[in-house]
Design a protein with these regions (language model features):
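Di-metal (Zn2+ and/or Mg2+/Mn2+) metal-binding site signature of metallo-dependent hydrolases
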Residues: 1-15, 88-91
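Active-site neighborhood of phospho(di)ester-bond hydrolases with catalytic His/Asp-centered motifs
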Residues: 1-3, 19-23, 81, 100-103, ...
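Solvent-exposed loop/turn segments at secondary-structure junctions
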Residues: 2-7, 24-27, 69, 86, ...
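Metallo-beta-lactamase
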Residues: 25-81, 96, 126, 130-133
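Charge-patterned, long linear interaction tracts outside catalytic cores
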Residues: 68-70, 74-88, 222-238
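Active-site-proximal loop/helix segments of hydrolase catalytic cores
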Residues: 75-132
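Divalent-metal (often Zn2+) His-rich catalytic cores of metallo-beta-lactamase-fold enzymes
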Residues: 121-181, 185
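C-terminal regulatory/interaction regions
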Residues: 174-238
């Protein structure tokens, strides 16, 4: 997907070919630079040596729904299974090993970053991933998830995180409550279950802001900028 902390490392590999889903490429066009700028402001330590990055990562090839490539005799299937962490997430399935790389669609004991997400679609995308019954998943963060029991646990853990966040914010939005009230409601619902998860505190304000927007009918996530970050923090402190 298009997030700067995920795609900007591509230049280090010196790859002659870069493949993206067409939705992800469209998001680089629309908001790639803004994401780079806002992430740099939030996490400067992640951008050490940024001077060596030649610029935004652009694909040489794109596809709409699915694409197959071969690494020697090994088949690798690239698929857009639905909106979740972003509108343009793809997953990679390696059939001969029954392994899937899900990126940030699936996490295990790590918070999901939902600031550019689609809460209402995320569960269906998780169902699509589950239907492959893979033996291992490489998630967005942390160790590989080995065995179908752990894969299932991670998918359901992700579903609980996403649903708990959205349900609490949506109840506040439905009665015309404020972003600060949504923040309080999500904390009450999620802190007892998820407060010890990696990057939970970092993700929470962005997750609440996006859940609150989606619940009020904003389908396309608003672009994050330095100014929007400031406005969000001011609203949450109110």
């Amino acid at each position: 997907h298009y997030h700067a902390v995920r795609v900007l490392g591509a230049s280090a590999f010196g790859a002659s070919q870069v493949i993206m889903g067409d939705k992800a490429r469209a998001m680089v066009v629309e908001r790639g630079q803004e994401d780079w700028d806002s992430e740099f402001q939030r996490f400067p330590r992640l951008f050490e040596g940024h001077e060596s990055i030649p610029g935004l990562t652009w694909p040489t090839t794109t596809f709409s729904e699915d694409m197959t490539v071969y690494l020697g005799n090994r088949r690798v299937d690239l698929m857009h299974l639905g909106r979740a962490h972003t509108a343009g997430d793809i997953v990679i399935h390696v059939p001969d090993q029954n392994v899937m790389f899900t990126g940030d669609i699936v996490e295990y004991h790590s918070a999901c970053y939902c600031g550019d997400g689609h809460f209402s679609d995320w569960g269906d995308t998780l169902d699509a991933i589950a239907s492959f019954q893979v033996d291992a998943i490489a998630p967005g963060r942390g160790d590989a998830l080995m065995g179908q029991d752990m894969v299932t646990a991670a998918i359901e853990n992700t579903r609980d995180f996403v649903d708990s966040t959205y349900a609490a914010a949506a109840r506040v939005a439905a009665r015309g409550g404020s972003l600060k009230e949504a923040w309080d409601a999500v904390r009450a619902a999620c802190d007892p279950k998820f407060k010890d998860y990696a990057i939970y505190e970092h993700c929470l304000p962005f997750n609440v802001a996006r859940a609150y927007d989606e619940a009020r009918g904003i389908d396309t996530p608003r672009i994050w900028t330095a100014q929007r970050d400031i406005e969000m923090w001011e609203a949450l402190q109110g």
